[in-house]
Every structure is written in structure tokens, then in C-alpha cells.
Amino acid sequence: MSTEPELHRNDSSPSRNPEDRRKRRRPEDYVEAISQHSTRAKEHFLHPGTHYRPLAQFLKGSLHKSLRIRTVSQPRPHIFAALHNLDCSFDDPNRVRFFDSKEGLDDFASYPLPRKNCGQLLFLRGYPSPKWVQLIGAKYRVDAEFFRRHLSIGQISEPFDISVLPSASQNIVKLSITSLGKQNVTLSKQGEGVDSLKDFHESLGDDPNVVGDSIVRRYSVHDKTRFSIEQDVTMCVLKTGESWIAIILLDCGRDLDEGPAGPWIESSSRPHMHGFDNVFNPVLLFEPNICLKSFEKKEGTSSSNGTQLLQKRCFQQSCSLLHTKSYGRFLSPAVMNTDAFYALSDVFNFAACAESQFLGLLKSKFMSETHLHNKEEHMKECLLDLKDHKLLLHEHIQGIQAVISIINDRGGSRWPRAGSASDAARMVSMTPSARRSSKESMLQVVVERPAITEQEMLPARSGAEAEAEAMAQRLLKDYEALRSDAQALSDLYSEGMRDIRDNAMLAESRKAIEQARGVGHLTLLAYFFLPLSFTSTLFGMNFKELGDDVSIWAC
């Protein structure tokens, strides 16, 4: 009798000993658990773990990385982790704690878990080190699949081992943020940028002393002066007893001029970077009465906000500020503390605004180049450009549709939601200042909310539920509008491609007509030339001399 089921049960069954559970929370035990699962081959296990081998090697530091030239020799100090305590008010100095990429590891290890009935947001910025992943994974018992998917670049994964099934992504939410850049693009072909990006991926993590390099998933050239990069935000929500924590992995970490070389910066221009203006356009966020509110809620100085503004940073991106104290400034603290999706709504809103600007760039580019579709010398170039951008749009439409599904599910079925816990328990768990801020915020919700019908009152919702639902509906409308705009733009690109093909066929028809006319002229010339040529040839032949009294007809 085979012993495989018994071995599998012994390996996977959780221990009931509390001491074993505490040991399993150690970083080394977290790595060992992943490493053991990665050794399970398909020949012996129904659930093989061979696709976790690269992650296990990464956590052990055994992935082979060749040290390459970096854009700067001494990177700036970097805030890698930012922890938001949602039970504190925005003015409370304990609301946000920042942890440096080097010295902050030990401080983070000793930082307590969220209090009862309280939530936390943990932002991790850039490419992590194995030690940070080990510590966070062990402390919060994070599913290894969460890290594996986010690190699915370079040597960490194969392109076919990321499942697209919704059931495989119940607590893994991924958003894409597009940043628009302006610079003199010297790459002659898009393929050169792809090769350079591949080298960039292979260089990530090559220096163990540098943590938090920005990750770029896609680099696209739109014309000679404009390009875009795509970066991911991967999120999950974990419950720790009666509290919860949301982990947000941001691709945006250090400025791109501090990390490995990439196609967005040429080797010849690196020494002169301080002479450039800002390379990336800002992401413009909309908030009603923002000009008035910004005076009432000052966002603090650079040091208190977790940023470094000591010198001009040409490659700074707007998403590099998502982790700061400014996050959630216009949200209700009480609802953030009880509803995980609402607490993460600013991330969804930021991604939507970035996507809107990206679609606006593509639309303006299409409109400004429409006149080139009729010029024969530009047809081939325009057709290839439209084809590439249509494929890019198709992937963006798929991403937008995925986000719409996430919003409809409110992130996940197990995410904490407003109304699941009593308001009294929530208010008791919050600090006094946060409690006052919560009452003012909820009062504002009640005052600003229009009259509701009886249908809307069934079932009756608390103020927190109403606020969370209103935010979800707002995001849903925004993303549905983005999907509609992207689809309309894709149709424009398809129409443009058809116009170019029609114009090309018309040009070929004109050429054929001109060639036919030329052939007609040649035929007319041949009509007269051939008999004349035959006659001249005939009389030019050598004949035997005839007598004077014999005619040629007699011959």
C-alpha cells in the first residue's frame, strides 16, 4: 500500500501545539516551509510545488545575480515600509510609522500587530530583499503565492505558471499604474526597448545592500518625445484575530535614476540628469473643493511625510507618495478602520486617474496623426504604430475589466466590511482624537447624503456602510467609464487601420491604372513599330541579284 497520502497529510496538517505555531512564525521557518513545498514533484504529488523553486531560491539568496553597473554609486536613503494605524486620527503622530530599508528591519520586527477591532495598512515600496519578505511573510502568515505573483519577473517565474482563474486570486488584487514620461527617445525600434527592459529585470536585486529599486513591467514608446511605463500594485488583506492588515506591494520605490539602467535613460545622458526637467508627468487626482480643503488639512513637511525633498529629483513619480501621511486624507477614518476596500479606495482612485491620463495621451496622439494616414510615405509606419497601440489597448481593457470585477466583489469575500462589527466596538478601539474625527466625518456623510427612497432603505444601512457603498459605486462608475473610453479608442484605432489599408489599396489601384496607361502607349507604338520593323528587316535581307528584265514577283 502506498504511503503517499499519509506523508502528504503529515506535511500539510497544521500543528495544534501553540509552541509549534510560534516557531512557524519565525522567518527561517517561513522559508523552510516554502522550500519544502517547492521540492514536491509532479511524479508523487497531486499539488506539485516546483513553480515555487525560484521563490525559494530568492528567499535563500541563492539566485545567481551578476552585479551590473547602476546609475548612481550611492543611492539616497529610502523608506521601504510605511505602516498606517487606522485607529489613530490623521493628526496623531502614531498614525504612520516609516521604516528605513536598512535599519528599519529590526524595528519592524518588534512593532506590534494591530489592536483588537483595528486595521493597518502596510505599504512596501520597490523590489524587496529576501529578509524583508521572510519577516513579513512569517509575521503575518502571508500566502507565498502573493509574493510569487508580485515578483513574477526575471528569474522568479515562467510566463505560463500564473493562474488566471478567479478562484486562484481570491485575496490577491493587482492594479496597474501607468506613468507618462517625456524625453528625447533615441531608440530606433520598440524591440530595443524590450531587450533593454529584460536586462533591467535581470539586474533587479543584484546588489544585496540596496533595497527598494523600482520595478517596471512594461516600457512603451509612443513617439519621439513621449513614452510610458507600467507598474503594478499587488494587495491582499489578512485577518489577525479580530483585527486586520492590508499589505500593499508597490512597484514604485526608489527613483528610476537610482536603480539599474533601463530604456528610459540612455548611458550618455546619465551624468547630465540634473539638467533635465521632471521626466514623468504628475498624476492629477480630483477632489471636490481641493483648493479649500488643502488649507484646512496641511499635509506636512517632507521629513514628517516620509519623503526626501533635499534636491531636485528628475525621475520622481506621483505614485512615490502613496505611502505618505497624505494617503486617505479625504476619507472617513472610522470607515477606513472597519472596511478594507474603503481603506484601499485611494489606491484604486489613483490607478484610475493614471489610466485616464494614459487614454487621453493615446487619443490626442491618434487625432494629431490622422492626416498622416493618407500620405503614402507614412502608411506603413502608421499601420505598425496603430497595430502596436491597439494591442496595448486590448491589454489595458482586460485589466480594467478585472478591476471592475474586483470592485463588484468589494475586494474579496473575506475582506472586513463596514457593518460587520458594531459601531460601539469600533469607536471604543479608536483613540479619542480619532473618535472625534470619526463623528465629524460621519455627520458630514449624513448631511451631504441626499434623501433616500424606501427601496434604498431596505435593508437599512449604517452611516459607515453607506459611505463605503458610495465609494464603491463611485469607483465602479469611473472604471466603467474607463472601459468605455478604452473600447471606443480601440475602435478608432481599428477604423484608422482600415482607412490606411483602404488608402494603400487605392494607391496601388492608381499605380496599376498608371501602369496600364503606360502599357497602352507601348501597345500603340508597337502597332506601328512592328510592321515597320518587319518591312525594314525584310528589305534589309541579302537577295540574289536579278537580271534587268526579271521582276521580283517572278522570283
Summary of predicted features, one role per range:
Residues 148, 157, 504, 540, ...:
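Hydrophobic alpha-helical segments
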Residues 2-378, 385-392:
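Extended N-terminal soluble domains of membrane/secretory-pathway proteins
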Residues 525-555:
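Alpha-helical transmembrane anchor segments
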Residues 335, 339, 350-351, 360-536:
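Membrane-associated alpha-helical segments
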